[in-house]
């Protein structure tokens, strides 16, 4: 884990897809449907999904080109299947979209979220939220199916501003929800571009580099990095004053 000096967080906000939820947990179903192509379909599906969100916001920041994330996810799936020459019929679409609606959580996610809920640095609980490109209905289903009900104070969707990350209007939802400055909130994402966008906006950022990818060449460095949620917990504990919550010892930054 790496870290730089940051203030005590008033809240921790998580990206959802790829950070809490494993977007590639659809591979098994995709591979069963298209043997030998499941991984390629999942990878291209995700790539086009992100591209389409960004293109729609870039084309018209006012939101005229906005489509809900569910629609974009379906469009991206259809493109990926055509690109790979796969015969994806309507029942197949439904099966894969149903899989996407109920993505698996990464194994390290729920235990660390519960630990964060228990923390009382300085006697106050740290607020927890999701800030996601997902539309509200998608997020509600995903949170429930992943066993995360009750772990978040807020589940924030960019649908409220009709602009996808990394648009500033999307990131502004976090400080507004908690009545805090962006600097006083830790924004957590596994997507390097998302961590960079949040950093530009002013958040304290933590990049969960699950894939072991190189840092983005964007001139902005996350305040902390790590390979999983346990590293995030260490990062938060080193920002916070000692509390009386049970469970973990403290470590020095960079340990």
PLM region spans:
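Short helix-capping segments at alpha-helix termini
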Residues: 34-38, 83-88, 121-123, 147-151, ...
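Asp-based, Mg2+/Mn2+-dependent phosphohydrolase catalytic module
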Residues: 2-9, 131-255
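Substrate-recognition element of Asp-dependent hydrolases with the DxDx(T/V) motif
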Residues: 90-102, 109-146, 156-158
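A metal-dependent, Asp-based hydrolase signature
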Residues: 39, 52-95
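An amphipathic alpha-helix signature
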Residues: 27, 42, 46, 70, ...
């Amino acid at each position: 884990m790496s870290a730089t000096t940051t203030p005590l967080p008033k809240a921790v906000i998580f990206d959802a897809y790829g950070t809490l939820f494993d977007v590639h947990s659809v591979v098994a179903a995709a591979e069963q449907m298209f043997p030998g192509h499941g991984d390629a379909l999942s990878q291209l599906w995700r790539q086009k999904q992100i591209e389409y969100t960004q293109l729609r916001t870039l084309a018209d920041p006012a939101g005229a080109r906005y489509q809900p994330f569910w629609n974009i996810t379906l469009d991206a799936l259809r493109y990926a299947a055509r690109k790979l020459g796969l015969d994806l019929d309507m029942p197949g679409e439904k099966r894969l979209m149903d899989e996407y609606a109920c993505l698996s959580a990464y194994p390290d996610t729920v235990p660390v979220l519960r630990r964060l809920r228990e923390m009382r640095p300085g006697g106050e609980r740290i607020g927890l939220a999701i800030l996601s490109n997902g539309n509200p209905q998608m997020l509600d289903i995903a949170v429930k199916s992943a066993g995360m009900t009750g772990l978040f104070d807020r589940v924030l969707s960019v649908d409220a501003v009709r602009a996808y990350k990394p648009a500033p209007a999307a990131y502004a939802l976090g400080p507004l929800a908690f009545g805090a400055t962006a600097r006083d909130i830790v924004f957590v994402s596994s997507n390097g571009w998302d961590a960079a966008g949040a950093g530009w906006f002013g958040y304290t950022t933590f990049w969960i580099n699950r894939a072991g990818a190189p840092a983005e060449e964007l001139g902005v460095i996350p305040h902390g990095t790590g390979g999983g949620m346990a590293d995030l917990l260490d990062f938060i504990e080193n920002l916070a004053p000692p509390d009386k919550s049970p469970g973990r010892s403290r470590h020095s930054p960079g340990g």
